[in-house]
């Protein structure tokens, strides 16, 4: 088991649901596990506080990159888990790409910035801070200054990211953003591949993918061996890995009380998400 996987377990960056209690996702779909890769910043508390800090900076785009960099640099020097994660990303990049061919490192709003700023610094490459509205800002590797940029004149880009699921952020924002800059997004290094089609989407776009850890049956079996999950949880996870939609649809058919209880929940987020599931008939239950 790689240290990245052990740290994913240790920091609870991968969180498994209790038996027969899958998590609601933002979309209204359900899943037996949830991934918060940014917890590799050190732990859940520090990662969550840093995300809140980033949120306070979103309206100040010119100063945001330097302020984010200052935080991650201190964390890199002081937190062994975060340092190991960044160093492992650097090794994966240098093992798979001729670094001399990379002109820019990019990172997209918001969780990519936990990783991309340090990658740029250590590789001594200028950094592109990308926003979901496709606006871009460029900084030198030491983030001494930042300015808006609209054209990188055919230069090459490697995006450093936390997680790939279906690659929706890439398709919707990061790939178009780099194209709008007249750049070429040729590589992406990310910590976790959820193995739900995103890597294939990126490869079809001509992007070389460099994941550190895969969420697959091998990882689930390791969690079982370590006593993190039980046999029932393992079977649900394996079913989900094989066919997420069918596995969760069958679960809902066999456990009608799950939706009934969610509809009675006093938690606003649960209420919102279960209504998306029911109103959208996301699992074709009616």
Predicted feature locations:
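PRPP-associated nucleotide enzymes
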Residues: 1-161, 165-286
């Amino acid at each position: 088991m790689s240290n990245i996987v052990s740290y994913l377990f240790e920091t609870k960056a991968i969180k498994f649901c209790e038996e027969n209690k899958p998590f609601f996702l933002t979309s209204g779909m359900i899943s037996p596990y949830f991934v918060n890769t940014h917890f590799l910043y050190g732990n859940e508390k520090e990662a969550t506080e840093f995300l809140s800090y980033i949120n306070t900076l979103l309206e100040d785009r010119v100063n945001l990159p330097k302020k984010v960099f200052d935080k991650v640099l201190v964390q890199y020097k002081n937190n062994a888990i975060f340092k190991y994660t960044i160093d492992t990303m650097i090794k994966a990049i240098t093992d798979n790409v001729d670094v001399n061919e990379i002109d820019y490192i990019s990172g997209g709003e918001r969780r990519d910035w936990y990783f991309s700023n340090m990658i740029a610094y250590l590789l001594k490459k200028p950094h592109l801070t990308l926003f979901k509205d496709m606006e871009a800002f460029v900084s030198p590797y030491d983030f001494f200054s930042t300015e808006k940029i609209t054209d990188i004149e055919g230069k090459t880009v490697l995006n450093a990211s936390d997680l790939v699921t279906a690659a929706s952020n890439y398709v919707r924002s990061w790939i178009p953003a780099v194209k709008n800059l007249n750049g070429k997004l040729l590589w992406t290094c990310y910590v976790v591949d959820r193995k739900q089609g995103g890597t294939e989407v990126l490869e079809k776009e001509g992007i070389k993918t460099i994941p550190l850890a895969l969420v697959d049956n091998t990882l689930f079996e390791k969690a079982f061996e370590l006593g993190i999950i039980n046999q029932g949880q393992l079977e649900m996870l394996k079913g989900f890995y094989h066919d997420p939609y069918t596995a969760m649809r069958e679960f809902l058919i066999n456990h009608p009380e799950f939706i009934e209880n969610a509809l009675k929940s006093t938690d606003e987020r649960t209420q919102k998400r279960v209504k998306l599931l029911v109103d959208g008939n996301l699992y074709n239950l009616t």
